[in-house]
Amino acid sequence: MTKFVFVTGGVVSSLGKGIAAASLAALLETRGIRVTILKLDPYINVDPGTMNPFQHGEVFVTDDGAETDLDLGHYERFISTKMTRQNNFTTGQIYESVIRKERRGDYLGGTVQVIPHITDEIKLFIRNGVSDAQVAIVEIGGTVGDIESLPFLEAIRQMSVQLPHHDTCFIHLTLLPYISSAGELKTKPTQHSVKELREIGIQPDVLLCRSDRPLPLEERRKIALFTNVREESVISAIDVDNIYKIPALLHEQMLDEIVCHRLDILARPANLTVWKKLVHALEHPEHEVSIALVGKYVDLTESYKSLSEALIHAGIHTRCKINIHYIDSENIEQHGTGCLTNMDAILVPGGFGKRGVEGKIMAISYARNHRIPYLGICLGMQLAVIEFSRNRLQLENAHSTEFDPDTPYPVLGLITEWRDRCGRVEKRSAQTDLGGTMRLGGQECLLKPHTLAHKIYGADKVIERHRHRYEVNAEFIPQLEQAGMHISGLSAEGDLCEMIELPQSEHPWFVACQFHPEFTSTPRNGHPLFKSYIQAAISFAGQSDRTKLHSRNVQESVTTDSSN
């Protein structure tokens, strides 16, 4: 039977419950325990698919096509278990399910209430999400005291009563603010947070105390006394400069041992060799590159969380320090491409909406003309096709019908039909609801032999995750290929363009993909596409300034001649 670790948060949000849960899961996994993680989100949205990235951050896509919370990305990066749609659910999904049951008459005419119907549904969703795991870590979104979180907290309280004593463990993540005028960490917010948790019937077994400095022994004893938590279970969770140090930090304070003891699990000792090697590689780079990430959500970098992590993973495996420069594409529209001058590579990620599109196209044109390594992801591939069509094919005003429905050259259009991971035919139109209606999840991509993409992956076919509605218009593919663009990846049916590239005789590294490779990158293995991209950036950075300038001037001359 699965045992449960419930992770809650107090005082403020964004303390890092997801990282804490993932780090504990990583420790348990190194001890030979089968572990999974669930994220319970209290918001009423059915999923985050249509939420503003500035409010929610990144939408992480699972292999089975679920649009989920970004914490699931952390889970997959820290442990080997792949997440599914059952690893993340929201208040919206719970109420939707309960209302469907009420309409069917499942409650036999009874009055449907938060207790027991909503709480029972939450418990059912939790049990359905654990699969065959020995331990399921369940992260409750929000903070203790939020009205939205109360049904979830009540549900896990009930589970702790209904299950055997050693089958549940409660971990509470809280904040210890440092007051500089007093010169000390203040424990009162933590005391009140735990008091509120205990008032609803939950006694935490472990406290993770977030702070910017180590927790002094006296404060540790004080917290233990006032919260009814054993002193050794009050753990200092200090700020670190990279998240991959956290498993070792928690292991040093015996968090995994405390949890195993609480759950009555006998397991082998933790082996952190892999994590220590990752941290060592991060802290001892042999190279350094600057990457321009040109997007529209750059004011909230969590909008590109998996992408920034994938670049860091590639840096680990190429012994390279990655400096990511987040550049607002609207600034390029207003002030030009001068901000790209000292970059060693350019990346245009996915996105939605017309705002900032022309700035991204300008960045792509700069990368192509100056032979700077370029990686386009999702929208970044679509805009590369638009840029190439306008400037190489001379198709003036070529565009995507997403941004210009009346474009004379619709080089990208809405997908109307495709097959999902189960082989079912999906059909969409411009009038279809936005939520959950994209081409989502893992899709097979066939790689053409003798292309850079095939060389990078070393395989004939790969499975990568998608999240988009628009695709390259097949009518324009012959013109694109005739002008020198290589269509290096196709969908399993061979009718959708998945990858494009320029020949290396023309450009050293210009690759773009319709899918999101960042969703499958892990610190342990990296991702072949990102590793190759960083290698290309290292090579470009290694050129002398004179060589770079000559390369750029020659390419500009060639481009000007071809335009004439």
Swiss-Prot record:
GO terms for cellular component: cytosol. Signal peptide: none annotated. Allosterically activated by GTP, when glutamine is the substrate; GTP has no effect on the reaction when ammonia is the substrate. The allosteric effector GTP functions by stabilizing the protein conformation that binds the tetrahedral intermediate(s) formed during glutamine hydrolysis. Inhibited by the product CTP, via allosteric rather than competitive inhibition. Its EC number is 6.3.4.2. It comes from the Bacteria. Mg(2+) binds at residues 71, 139. CTP binds at residues 13, 146-148, 186-191, 222. It catalyses: UTP + L-glutamine + ATP + H2O = CTP + L-glutamate + ADP + phosphate + 2 H(+); L-glutamine + H2O = L-glutamate + NH4(+); UTP + NH4(+) + ATP = CTP + ADP + phosphate + 2 H(+). The keyword Secreted does not apply. ATP binds at residues 14-19, 71. It holds the Pfam family CTP_synth_N. Pathway: Pyrimidine metabolism; CTP biosynthesis via de novo pathway; CTP from UDP: step 2/2. Residues 1-265 are annotated as: Amidoligase domain. L-glutamine binds at residues 351, 379-382, 402, 469. It is an enzyme of class 6 (ligase). One of its GO terms (biological process) is 'de novo' CTP biosynthetic process. Belongs to the CTP synthase family. Homotetramer. Catalyzes the ATP-dependent amination of UTP to CTP with either L-glutamine or ammonia as the source of nitrogen. Regulates intracellular CTP levels through interactions with the four ribonucleotide triphosphates. This is CTP synthase. It comes from Nitrosomonas europaea (strain ATCC 19718 / CIP 103999 / KCTC 2705 / NBRC 14298). The lineage of its organism: Bacteria, Pseudomonadati, Pseudomonadota, Betaproteobacteria, Nitrosomonadales.
